[in-house]
Structure formats: C-alpha cells, structure tokens
Amino acid sequence: MRPELVAVLDRYFSEIISCFFLGWLLNFLLVWFCSTKSTFLLWSVFLYICYYILRIEFAYIVAPFLKTIYTNSSQYHTVDWAYAYTALPKGLWEQITDYNYCYNFPPPRVEGFVSDFSPRFTLKELEIMNEANITPVHTIPKDTLLKRASDYKLAVESKKSILPRVQDLYEMDKWHNLRSKLSKNAPSYVTTSEIAVGAMSGAGNTKLAIPVVEKYTEEVADDRLPDRVRAKADQIMVAAIELVADGFASVNSDVTMAGALYDKRHKTIASSFKGAFASRASGVPSHVIYFPMHRVPACDDPNTTLELSMVSRDSDFDEGYTLANISARTLYVRAKGPEKVTETRHLLKAKTEDVVKARQFASEAQVVFATPRLFPEVNLDNYNLPGPSNAQQTEAITTDRGILFPKPKFKGNEVVLNYTGSGKIRNVGSQRFETKKNATGEQFVRSVDDLGCLSDEDGKDYRYGQGLMEEDVLNVQTNNFAIESATETMRLLFSGYASIPLNVIPGTKITVAYLNELSKHSAVHTGLLNMLSKIPGSLKVKINCQVAPTCGIGLAVSYVEGNESANLGSSLGRLLGIQHYKWNPAIEPYVEFVFKPFSCADWWNMHYLGSFKFAPVVVIQTLSKWLNAPKVDARISFAIYYEPTVVLPKQIATLEHAPAFMFRKEVGTLAFKQGERVAYSFEVNLGKPQTDGKEVTSTFASSYCGLSQYMQSDVILDFTLMSSPMIGGTFSIAYVAGAYIEKVGNMQILDSLPHIDFTFSSGSKSTRSVRFPKEVFGVYQALDRWDLDSARGDDVSGNFVLYQRDAVSSALEGELTFRIAARLSGDISFTGVSAGYPTTITRIGKGKTIGRSLDPEIRKPLRYMLGQAHATPKDFSSVRFVMGHWKYRAGLYPGSKSDEDIHPFSLKMRLDGSKSSENFEIIHSPFVRLLQNCAWMRGTLRFYVVARASSDYMSYRRTSQLTVSAHENSLSSNQFYSGVLTSPSGELSFSREVVGPVDGFASMGWNVRGSKKFYKIHVEMGNVHEYDTVVLYGQFDSNVEFAGQRKGGHYLLEKETPIFKTIKY
C-alpha cells in the first residue's frame, strides 16, 4: 500500500472517531433525563464502531510500520547505491540506515617483516591485475572504484535552494518554539537567507570569506566568572552550508570553475580541508551542500573562519568582467553547547560521509583520480585546486656529476583533479612502505618527473622553491591581513573641509587632493601602506555638504588620473573624466564616490602616484553658480579611505572591444524660466569632441569613437538637477530620427515618437537617468563627422528633443536648471574604420571652413586614406593615420632652389603627438587623439615616414638623401631604428612595442616612477630645397590596449558654438 494513501486514511479515521465521540457526548446530555435504556444502546453502538476502526488502523498502519522496521534491520539490509551518497531528505516512510566507517593505519615494514595488516598486493601488481585496494586485505576492480568515487560532491543545477530543513537535521518537537522563548538555555535554530559572498572575475582566481551568520554580534561574558561558566556562552554550530555558483559565461562555452572550502584556523590540509566542488560557469546556477562539523566559540567571529578558494580554467572570459557570483545559505544553531541539541540520523550520516570523503580527497599525495559528476560533461583533467600555501626552498649541491637539487617537499600546496600523468606517484599508498634500493640516487631532482607535484603545464610549480647556489638568503615577507580587517575609521587616509563661496562660477575648484601627498599624512595605516608594494582594492571619498532645500548648486567630484601639466586648470570638460560623480547638495547632503587609482590594474601603490608636478588628483568643483544662494558660505567636509575589498572593473579597451562605462560625454546645461514653455533639440555624437561655448575638449570617448564610422549601442541620458528641488516641472525627452526634426512643430508630433516623461523630487537622487535602447535608433549612429555647429544637421543621424509638459512654477524665484550628460550602455558594436579629419592644434573658428590654411597643393597627402568604405576592425591593420606634416615654403629657408643651394634641415617630433615638436605640424588624427587622451597604453605601434621630392629637380641633379632615426627618449638617447631613403621619393617604416611598469602598461602624459618619456623621431634632410612634403603616419597593431582617461586636450574657438537648438511650440 502506498505511504501517501495510508497517511490520508489515518487522518480520515482520526476525524471519524472524533465526530463519533462528540456525537455520543451530545446524545448523552439529551437522554440524561429520559431513560437508562437509551444510554445503554448509545454506549454499545459507540464501542462497536470504535472497535472496527481500530482494527482497520492496525491492519493498514501499525502492521506495515512494524514490518518495515523488521525488514530494515542490519540482518536484512542491502545498500541502495543510487541514494547512498546523496544529501537529499528521505520520504515519509523511508528508513535511513547508519553507516560505520573504520580507519586502519598499517605500520610500515621493518627489515622486510610483513605484518597481518599490510596490503596484499603491491602497486605494480595492482596495475597489472587492474585492481585497487579498498581495505588492507580486500580489492575490487579499478573501474568500479572510479565509478563510485566520482560521486564525491554532486553539484546540482537548480533555480531553487536545496538546503535541508531544520527538522531534517535536528530532533525538534512542537513545543520547541515555546520553550525557546521561556528558557534562556534553549538552542536557537537559524536558517539564513541568501548572503552574497563575492564575485570571481575573468582572471579566474580568487579567495572569498564564507559568511556563516548574517550579522555577527559578539556575546560578552563577565571576566569575573569562572572559566567553566564563561565557556557556556552561546556557541555557533554550523550544520549545513549551501554554496551557489552563478556563472555568466556563454551557454555554449566550456569554461569551468572549481572551489575548495577549508577552515582558516588550521594549518594542515588534512585538518583544514572541508571539501571541493566543480561546475561549469554558465547556464543554471550550481548548488552544492557541505556538512562541515564546524563549531565557533562566542568570542570569535564565525564569518572569518571559513574560506572558499575559487579558480577557473579554459577561460576566454575578459578579466574586466565578472565570471561568476558566489552566494551562500547556512543552517546553524546558537546554543550553550553540543549537548543542548540532538542531531538526526540524516545529519550524522552526512557529516560522517563528508569527513571521510574530505580525507580521501586531500590525501598525502594530493592527487585525485576521479572528479565530481557534472552535467553537461566538462574536461577537468589535471585541474589544479589551490590549498594552504606551504613550500620549502632547497639549495643546490655541487658534485662532480653536476648541480643537484634535493626534492622540495610539498605539504598542502594544492589538490589535482583527474591526474592523467604517470601512475607512479611518489610517497603514495603502499610505495611509501617499500625499502628504497638506491636512497642516494632517489634523493635528488634529475628531471621534471622526479618532482613532488606534477600539475602545472607551464612549469611554474617545477621551479617553485628552488635556488641556484645561494646561501643565507633572507626573504622579505608582507601580509595584507592588517589592512583587510581594519574598520573604516582605521582606513582613513586624508580628510579636510572647505567652503563654497557665494560668488562661484561653473568650474570653480572647491578643494583639490593630490594623491602623491597621501604617503606624508599621519593616518593610522599610512606607515603600513608605505611598506606594501601592492595595495588591493580602490579608494573611496565621502563628502558631506548640508544646504537648505531652498538653495541649489551643482557639484562634481572627479578623479583625474593623468594630470599632464602642473596647472590643473578649472575646465569641466577636461576634468570630468570616466570616473566622476555629480550631485546637488540640496537633494543629496551625503554622497560616496569610489574610484580606481590605477585603471589598468586591481591594485595601487602609495609611491607610484605621480610626482610633484604630474600627480593624479581628486577634485571637487562646481557645475554651476549658486541658484538661490544661502545667506552665508556653505561648508563641505570630505574624507578619503582605502577599500581593500572593493575591486572595480578594469578600464581597458582594445581595438575590437571596449567596456560601455568608458564612454561618457558632457552635453551641456539648460535653464527653464518660470511661466514659459520651450523645447530644445540636441545631438549626442560621441565621436565629436565636447563643446562648451568657445572651448572644445577631446576625451577618451571622442578619441576612441573617432576611430570608427558608425556605432550601435544603447544611450543613457543623465539629467542632474542643479537648482532647488522646490522648483518643479515635468519634462519629456524624445528621439527624432534623421531630418524629421525640421517638421516638429507641436507636442502632438513629439508624443507620437519614442519618448519618456520624468521629473525631479526632493529626498531622492539628484540625477534622473533615461535609457534609449539601440532598437529605437534604427540606423547606425554616425561618429566621424567634424562639423561642431549644431545648426548644420546634414550629417546628423538623429536628434533628441527635450520639451516641457507643464510650465515651471514655484514659490521661489529663479530658473529650473539641470545638466545633461550622455553615456553608452550594454553591448557596443562599432562598424567601419575612419581615418579622421585634419584638425591642428592651432585650429580656430568653428566648422570646417574657417581657420584652415591648407592650400590645395597639400590636400592629397593630408587626406591620405580618407573616406574609407564600410569596414570591419580588421581594417586597422591597413589604415594609416596621419600624425605630422611638413611642406616646403619658398623664401623660408636659407639659400635658393633656383641657385641649387644645399641646406641641411631637420624635423623633430615626439611620437605620441605631444607639443614637443620642431618644424613638424602636428595633425590631430584619431591616432594622435587616442595617444593623448588615454592614461595607460601597451601594445605595438607602427610608424611610416613618406617623403615626396620636388619636381623642380631632375634625378641626375639630386645630391640629397633623407635619414630617419627613432630614439628611446630624447635625441641624445640611443637609437632603436635608423633608415636612409636613397630614392628621391619613398617611404621608411618601423615599429615599436610600448610597455610600462604597471602590469605592462606605460603611463601616457603623466609620471609614474620608473617610466620614461615617449619615443622621438628625427628626420634629417640633406638638402631642404630638394623636398616638397614629408608626412608622418601611425598605425595600430592588433595587440594595442588602452586604459583610463587623462586630462582631456582642448583648444579654443573664435566664436561660441551652440549646442542646443531652440524649438518653439
């Protein structure tokens, strides 16, 4: 009979008996005064019915239950291997069987004597007969052992939690909740919600602390009490831990990840190792449960005792993105001691099984011949799981046979999954009890196979712990534990305060903090940070500025990573880089700003943050003047902390891919008067420089986007309210594609287009963000246009129109003012390669017609490779970007062309396009702009010098040759390239890999200790009168990477260029 049907019948029978009993009681009261005969009949019927009900219940419930107990005794028990190693709770009527595990440790052989507990077969004999030991005297086929050992820890792919209930792990009755409220000594059972543990980046190696309790509060015991009384404070006993690994790799990828859980309080791997699991890094999240038998006293923080070490393999995942998120759920007991709780058979079985498998997994050899079952199947051969670090340095011994190294002893260094190398593992199993025939010969390392660890294919482990003829070498050690466990007040680096005057203007600097001065401040951990070579994490700025809600002003805090000049300036376009935050103190009196000191690395250093003149800067400045100013100056306080656990994504862009958060652009500021309604149209083109009045600023976004012709991406518009939040209004933003902007005349037309409404309110964020998906734009968005005037819209893909739903109104005086910025989001795709347009550092005026002194004779060489067709990123290998140009001008040089005078002449230029050039006119192509706006760079650059001879000289009359040399630093440094052009006209080319001290990146435009200035080129003409033009071109190789943004380059126009176009409706 099925158990579910039996349970239903039992419930129905109990209800019938209760109804008969109540009916009998009611009839008894009714016939109490009638007759004795009725009472007798009522008793008889009741007893008769109860008799048959009890018989039926015994036959169908009690008898099967007793039969199940008898058949499940040890005499009749057979193991069901399908469910023997699972941690799933059993059914209602299913009996759980206990298991006994015995450990037999055979003594070593002594002088050839074989004891009764020695293995029956040697390792060589077992290899021949294809069998393996399971006890000292029993063997089974190796295939059977591998099949059963493969179910070490099953990673379950599920969208729901698989953590057992409290009732499955501890014996509880229905009065437990009431008893726990009345008694102080009653245990408290807690099942936590899902707690975020951390994330593993695409780099594929991380260590994470596993939180046991959601919020730890230390229980303080009176020191005056005896030890036995103080020891009875509440302990934390962890029954089960569920780890959830949510991978973000592509579903069709083979990226795998593995983790090892261990107790940090132990130093040996046998005591510390709690278990491991492996999973794929894509698809449905993987769940795995551990029963760690973990107890923590009241005086220790349980959230610092367990640690998870995660690694990934076969990963083509980008390091700047998150590969997997790790979270945990725990079931623990807070009690006075283990005697206060009663564990179920299920928990006892699971705990014992975890201990046995952990011991088998982390054996002395640390080599596992089987791995967890996975679906779908993934390749985990020779998977290297990190363990507690412990290595021994060995010194070389010089003999007449050569230099020999004693074998390094690896104790708890790593665990290897699915070892596929030689089956003969040193010091494993029965082999460690064999008598060594040639002890002296086996003592030294003669080949790779003689080493104790055979895991790493690159050979890093083979070289670990070996020295070459060194004696008395002292190793310097550092430990990051002190900075990682410090509280926030101890992590303070610098603090200060300032005032916001009443006469500020947009761009006024409120306060400036140069990061190269951090090492000189007397903070708590400054001395320790000065000692460390790499400080993990980021920096955080906390800012507090209290103003009345009737006031309003826009503020911005920005991190200027590459400050290439001693004069910081106050230009908003130059200082608002990739890492900044804008807010209104009337809405947000308290803000936090976290930034990455080195945008190309996950660490920073106190002594590599620039020099006295060229140091990275944290600057707080105004975005606007006071809008309804206060009566007195407002005060602002700030503090800088280091955050060792907060690791922001790297800001690294390649020619084929760039993260979306690196693309930002400041559009401008709009003001709306009260009682009026107006609409504005504007263009968001990240390939154009930022324009603010007469000032034009090139940023990393405009430089990188200038390399391409078209883009497809989501666009987010940020509206930061700078006026008082008590001045309100409702606005709409719509996108008008193509030339349809010319037909917009009323709100009805705008409402028929893709649009969204928004407003500002007090008590929320200062910024409203609106996303326009890329599906809204239809066609690709143009990037490589050069006309800065918004009135000329011939080559504009589309316009955004901002219009009012209602008139601005308030009891206060003034205008509603906000600042507009644009940024990209989601997956960005660039199409086509653009060689850019010939702008110069001396460019004045607006548009492409005013201020140009490029006469028709040099149009062709300057516009070399312009107007590319529809292209792919592979075209970067063929497109050359113009960098510098020289043209012969009559009467400018000594001598005369007609008299055939000879006058040598030199052209000099630094190859990053900076101002230190001589006789070369710098052409600001996308190549030059990108080199001048990125903070870091590494990769190969190619350069070409194209010379055109004058047609006035016949070939037989030429006496000149052109020599090109490239130097490491200045012209007084050594040359790394030298070439001679023997023909009248021709081309010379060379390449150079740019490297630097910070993870291989070179700092561009600012000083990092150990870096040097950029390369310089020298073009020497034997006779200047024989040449017409000399043009310098640059080209990117496919391995080029750019990181971060330094202070943007800028120039001024003759007249102001409007950004917004007013539309009256």
Curated annotation (Swiss-Prot):
Q: Which SUPFAM superfamilies match?
A: Positive stranded ssRNA viruses
GO molecular function terms noted in the UniProt entry: DNA binding; RNA binding; structural molecule activity
| Entry keyword Cell inner membrane | no
Q: Does the keyword DNA-binding apply?
A: yes
The UniProt keywords, alphabetically, are: Capsid protein, DNA-binding, Host cell junction, Host endoplasmic reticulum, Host-virus interaction, Inhibition of host innate immune response by virus, RNA-binding, Suppressor of RNA silencing, T=3 icosahedral capsid protein, Transport, Viral immunoevasion, Viral movement protein, Virion
Biological process annotations from GO:
symbiont-mediated suppression of host innate immune response; transport of virus in host, cell to cell
Q: Which GO terms describe its cellular component?
A: host cell endoplasmic reticulum; host cell plasmodesma; T=3 icosahedral viral capsid
**One family name in Pfam for this protein:** Como_LCP
Q: Which InterPro entries match?
A: Como_LCP, RNA2_polyprotein, Viral_coat
> Where does the entry annotate site (Cleavage)?
466-467, 868-869
Designated name of the protein: RNA2 polyprotein
Q: Which organism is it from?
A: Broad bean wilt virus 2
